[in-house]
Amino acid sequence: MTKLDAKSIINYIGNAPKKTPVKVFIKGQLDQIDFPEEIENFNETHSGVIFGDWKDVEPFLKENQDKIQDYRIENNARNSAVPMIDMKKFDARIEPGAIIRDQVAIGKNAVIMMGAIINIGAEIGDDTMIDMGVVLGGRAIVGKHCHIGAGSVLAGVIEPASATPVKIDDNVVMGANAVVIEGVHVGEGAVIAAGAVVTHDVEPHTMVAGVPAKVIKKVDDQTESKTGLEDNLRKI
């Protein structure tokens, strides 16, 4: 994936065709209906499913109402500019319920848990675990072999375009429900305690805690023994 800066993301969203995707379960005299190219159809004689943009599907349903006995519509977005990413292309473990938008980079053997939300432009390094309910905002960067604890938030910055994104270096461990404010750089091997709100850069191999987060100590053998990561969880 080509890395996108803020201006590129803004242009991508601004110029993208806005779509309202729908799936319609339909029954009727379907063999008597001509389906336009812009509507995908998987139909038999009297029942089937169609997929398309609502701007195309709505008039189609009205034009063929005399041949359609009944239908049910499923819809999960309105005028959406950014589709969900094709997860099949990643050599990573992505659990059900993760929400990942297009233009996201995910490294080899990364783990994305249930309920994680990853916005456009975010980057996740090899062997990094994004735990349940984590929010990675636009352009947030997480390095290799990290653990971002459940419920944590890495603030996103798409606007203003001049803003600096959150950057988490390699081998960082972040406890549950921690928050890292936009523009903050967390150095390699740092530890962020659960519930911390990080408003300033964190030096490498440093442990911070509190609201706002303050330095507690340098990471030592005792800290590493309590925050060590399990590579078996990252096997595909």
UniProtKB/Swiss-Prot annotation:
UniProt cross-references to HAMAP family, sorted A to Z: DapH
InterPro entries: DapH, DapH_N, Hexapep, Trans_hexapeptide_repeat, Trimer_LpxA-like_sf
NCBIfam families from the UniProt entry: DapD_Ac (TIGR03532)
EC number(s) given by UniProt: 2.3.1.89
Record keywords, A-Z: Acyltransferase, Amino-acid biosynthesis, Diaminopimelate biosynthesis, Lysine biosynthesis, Repeat, Transferase
Enzyme class: transferase
Pathway in which the depicted protein is active: Amino-acid biosynthesis; L-lysine biosynthesis via DAP pathway; LL-2,6-diaminopimelate from (S)-tetrahydrodipicolinate (acetylase route): step 1/3
Homology family: Belongs to the transferase hexapeptide repeat family. DapH subfamily.
Cystines in this chain: none
Function: Catalyzes the transfer of an acetyl group from acetyl-CoA to tetrahydrodipicolinate.
Reactions this protein catalyses: (S)-2,3,4,5-tetrahydrodipicolinate + acetyl-CoA + H2O = L-2-acetamido-6-oxoheptanedioate + CoA
SUPFAM superfamilies: Trimeric LpxA-like enzymes
Molecular function (Gene Ontology), one example: tetrahydrodipicolinate N-acetyltransferase activity
Lineage per the UniProt record: Bacteria, Bacillati, Bacillota, Bacilli, Lactobacillales
GO biological process, one term: lysine biosynthetic process via diaminopimelate
Protein name: 2,3,4,5-tetrahydropyridine-2,6-dicarboxylate N-acetyltransferase
Name of the gene: dapH
Species of origin: Lactobacillus helveticus (strain DPC 4571)
Database matches in Gene3D superfamilies: Hexapeptide repeat proteins (2.160.10.10), Malonyl-CoA ACP transacylase, ACP-binding (3.30.70.250)
